[in-house]
Amino acid sequence: SVATVPVSGKLPNLDTYPEIKPQYVTPEMKDNYTPYKRNPENQVRYWAIPGQEGYTHILGGLEKDSNTGAISTDPENHNLMCHLRAEKVAKIAVPDVEVQGCADDADLLIVGFGGTYGHLYSAMEEMNKAGQKVALAHFSYINPLPKNTAEVLKKYKKVVVAEQNLGQFAGYLRMKVPGLNISQFNQVKGQPFVTRELIDAFTKLLEE
């Protein structure tokens, strides 16, 4: 199945990643500490180390007041919290999506995400060997999308989004990138893509 296909990969070198510096509470906050106060630049809350006097707070799964952290059933507060969480996610830094294959002059860009990578890459590779100019942009991050998403998707003459569902990612991309003109290749068979079927479908798109 897609979930159990073995794929070789290199272990990341953690030394190449930027240092993560948590936002801890400061001594000045002690007398007026509110556990849900956020840094307005990134909507991240300040960390209080458990056991420190003056920084007692409770964690839980119910909706909280946007300031005090107390359980809240207020509709306006819930609406605000949903927007704050969405804004926080939108500000997460993710790497640009990379384009493989004929990145500079492809006549068709294949777009995929998740466990379909191997089959899509094989289809692209075989088509390029046959003289067809094809590229692949495989997304590892979809919320938020990489900052270069619109630039990549609008660069090529034809774009096809291949997914093992009814086109949810294609619809999401249309919503996030207005004016996007893309084709779809969708299957819901409970089985991995077949490379030959992908090549046939993509070749047909190139011939249109």
Question: Which positions does each model-derived feature cover?
Answer:
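Flexible, low-complexity linker and terminal segments
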Residues: 1-208
